[in-house]
């Protein structure tokens, strides 16, 4: 075996070990330009979804992304786009879609993956945080949305503050939460600055134990889908302008 082969195997093994270690991480800290919050990941019960999320974390792809959608009393959504001094938002590079793991209910303070309509196994990078108990809706749409983490009640203060920000519609994007930006600014078509958007500055692992979710009182999915994972219909839709590729959850009246 030559030196190049040995080196290649060693590098591959090191990468595998790093990935395996990261898969055990169960608490991450998300730092935004308006505050920090932690997500306790359910790696023991939704391993595929958690590993997918951590792959984006380890690659730094969530750093610099923005909260691109906010619907009061429903969800805030992120993990898909960056702002480069002007609209439209730019989509981040995504990995292959993952299998659906709808084990837990979409109750307040849980984090779940967004996905395409009529396709249960289409989640990639985008996620959303439930602002209310949305199980009656999101547990049944599109074979259920995969909840893979939870935010503490204390840290939800940061999430609620984001949800309380005014929202604006722009070409290609609706319900964009902004700070230090007014309706008059929008009427005057004032250009957005980076500081106006809610930006995720970093996502880092802060607790690498594999069982930190064991003490949580998790709520099972209220309507588990059939084993075939057949979709019951349009849970998500593209926004009006397709080039953004923005995933959108449907809120029922």
Placement of each model-derived feature along the sequence:
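Cyclophilin-like peptidyl-prolyl cis-trans isomerases
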Residues: 21-238, 249, 253
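Bacterial N-terminal signal peptides
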Residues: 10-18, 243-246
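Bacterial N-terminal signal peptides that target proteins for export
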Residues: 1-10, 235
């Amino acid at each position: 075996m030559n030196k190049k082969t040995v080196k290649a195997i060693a590098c591959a093994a090191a990468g595998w070990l790093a990935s395996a270690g990261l898969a055990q991480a169960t608490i991450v800290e998300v730092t935004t330009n308006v505050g920090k919050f932690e997500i306790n990941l359910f790696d023991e019960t939704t391993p595929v979804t958690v590993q997918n999320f951590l792959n984006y974390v380890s690659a730094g792809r969530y750093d610099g992304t923005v909260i691109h959608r906010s619907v009061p009393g429903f969800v805030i959504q992120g993990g898909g786009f960056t702002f480069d001094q002007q609209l439209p938002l730019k989509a981040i590079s995504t990995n292959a879609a993952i299998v659906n793991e709808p084990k837990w209910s979409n109750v307040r303070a849980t984090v779940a993956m967004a996905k395409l309509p009529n396709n249960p196994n289409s989640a990639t990078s985008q996620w959303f945080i439930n602002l209310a108990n949305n199980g009656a809706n999101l547990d049944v749409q599109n074979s259920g949305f995969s909840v893979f983490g939870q935010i503490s009640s204390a840290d939800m203060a940061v999430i609620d503050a984001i949800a309380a920000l005014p929202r604006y519609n722009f070409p290609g994007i609706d319900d964009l939460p902004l700070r230090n930006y007014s309706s008059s600014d929008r009427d005057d078509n004032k250009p957005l600055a980076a500081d106006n958007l809610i930006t995720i500055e970093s996502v880092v692992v802060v607790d690498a134990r594999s069982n930190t979710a064991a003490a949580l009182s998790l709520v099972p999915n209220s309507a588990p889908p059939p084993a075939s994972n057949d979709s019951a219909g349009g849970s998500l839709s593209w926004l009006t302008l397709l080039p953004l590729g923005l995933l959108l959850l449907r809120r029922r009246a």
